Amino acid sequence: MRSTEVVIIGAGAAGLMCALTAAGRGRKVLLLDHANKAGKKILMSGGGRCNFTNMYTEPGNFLSQNAHFCKSALARYTQWDFIGMVAKHGVPYHEKKLGQLFCDNKSSDILEMLLNECDQVGVSLHLDTSIQTIEKLEKGYLLDTTLGQVTCESLVIATGGLSIPTLGATGFGYQVARQFGHELLPTRAGLVPFTITDQLKELCTELSGTSVDCLVSCNDQSFRENILFTHRGLSGPAILQISSFWESGDTVEINLMPDHDVPSWLQQQQAERPNSELKTLLGEIFTKKMANLLADNWFVSKPMKQYTHGEIAAIAEKLASWKVVPAGTEGYRTAEVTLGGVDTNEVSSKTMESLKSPGLYFIGEVLDVTGHLGGFNFQWAWASGYAAAQYA
């Protein structure tokens, strides 16, 4: 039987940060993962360049039933702390937009940095390792694994959520939480594209690959970024962002011309260019194909002088407030994150330790904390992993 001080299950972003930090303060750490490679989500993130944090991280960028839970960890390990580690290792990076930091080269720069840090402090990493059972001891935990039996003082669950099962995502962390008496908040896919099945499907298919700067709103939340038309429906950063606030049956409102006061713009065009066709004017804002499709699908395109005031108002309403009721989302298959999870009211916000079972910790995406798109979920992984490592 193997004995150690800390066992961390899950060698993703949160697990790696927790391991290197705990071992760095002298703890004997065993890091286990059922996959054949550590940090798979790190490697595929940001189109292979890893959007590893956001310069503007603050608690307001996170969704949780307990809005205050993330504050302590985010304050104690900030984006600047992680940027400092990146700089120490000489990993070149840049800001893409909106505070989003990406590697100049490839995501593996971040993974190699974390693995090097783990090596330097003696973390024992074992991949292709499954956990059969976990049992609470008088002091600590007993794990039955494919490595054999392992005992530990502290057990950290860093197994992530259900998003992107092809990378090995499972509900293991939720099973452990349930086993030790924790409530789970309902889970669903977040930061995920919408599917469309009504008459809009044909429009989306025709425009597949077209990207447009929009203001997208739902349930009192709004995001100004691009939307992307796809064969299945709608995607792009603004759609992924709003998907975390959308519930089945909700209407999503899309302003296709956020830089314009659309009614005034149309009236101005009617006054100044009365002989120009609507599709010609829209072609100066959108691609010609999109302008033609919108004009053909939504309006009867004719010279501006032929529209009545009522028709102009209806066109403005459609362009500035296009209402879409998605059929659903693409689900966990393509979702970047999982909403819901372990109820944070049953976990210490200071230590990440279970309030139900001493010595058990939960970090990262397995908890009911979900960041906006743009590096925030990685920052939660770093911060929650660091917080737990101070006490595990």
Regions found by a protein language model. Give the residues of each.
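N-terminal Rossmann-like FAD-binding beta1-loop-alpha1 element of flavoenzymes
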Residues: 4-31, 388-392
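Short hydrophobic core segments
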Residues: 7-9, 32, 131, 150-166, ...
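Glycine-rich FAD pyrophosphate-binding loop
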Residues: 23-47
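An anion/pyrophosphate-binding glycine-rich loop and adjacent beta-alpha core
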Residues: 36-38, 43-44, 52-59, 92, ...
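Glycine-rich active-site loop/strand segments that organize a redox cofactor
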Residues: 49-95
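A glycine-rich dinucleotide-binding beta-alpha-beta segment and adjacent secondary-structure elements
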Residues: 127, 292-370
